[in-house]
Every structure is written in C-alpha cells, then in structure tokens.
UniProtKB/Swiss-Prot annotation:
Record GO terms (molecular function): nucleic acid binding
HAMAP family, per the entry: UPF0102 (MF_00048)
Pfam families recorded: UPF0102
Name used for this protein in its record: UPF0102 protein DVU_0833
Source species of the chain: Nitratidesulfovibrio vulgaris (strain ATCC 29579 / DSM 644 / CCUG 34227 / NCIMB 8303 / VKM B-1760 / Hildenborough) (Desulfovibrio vulgaris)
UniProt signal peptide: none
Annotated family: Belongs to the UPF0102 family.
InterPro entries xrefs: Restrct_endonuc-II-like (IPR011335), tRNA_endonuc-like_dom_sf (IPR011856), UPF0102_YraN-like (IPR003509)
Amino acid sequence: MVDARHATGQHGEDEAAALLQRTGHRIIARNWRHGGLELDIICETGDTIVFVEVKTRAAHGLTSPTDALTHQKRHRLIRAARAWLAAADAWDRACRFDLVCVTQRGATCTLEHITDAFDLTETLGGGDTSWQPW
C-alpha cells in the first residue's frame, strides 16, 4: 500500500516527466537507484544529459519545493549523477541539474521548471573543482 506522501510524490514525478516530454526532453530513466542514491528523472535535450530533481508540495505547506534542495541534497545528487555517468559510460556528455517544483492544489498542480538549478562550483566548495573526472 502506498501512503499519501508517496502517492503525492509519484504524482508530482509523473507530472514533471510529462512536462519535460512536452518541452522536448527525452526521458532516459526514472527513479534510477544506486545503493542509497536516487535520481528522480534522467533525460536528455540536444546533446545534454539532464538530471532532474522533482520536489512536490501541497499548496498549504509551510515551505516551498525549492527549500528542499539543500546543500546536502545537492551533494547526493552529484554523487548519484557520477554513479549514473560511470554506469552509462557517458563521462563525455555535457550535463546539468534541473529542478521541477510541483505545487498541488487539490486535483490541479502548478509546475515550475528551473534549468541549472544550482551552481556546481558553489556546491563543491568553489575553485576549480571538477565533478566530472577529466
């Protein structure tokens, strides 16, 4: 049995995937897991691999979906992306991290797609820190 929180999250991910497809993204994988790491949606647009985090909240919630993309969460996303790139042997591909915020109001929802949702340099501590090993 799926609890209400998981059902809400699944509905948000379904809506986000549909939005991405409508805007020309090709879905490669959903809910990709490696150990304790997970990527909600992996897709591509043009030559770029896009790792998409989906955050779903009820409209009456006290926090916005963007508040859930903490520094720690960004690090986990980067680790998961590294694992996927290694598994797919796709280190030569351009990559970015997007965020799709889903706010549910009853049976309807509002979606916001944030491209390049966070700065890798800031997340990885500044300087010339490359997250891809080349």
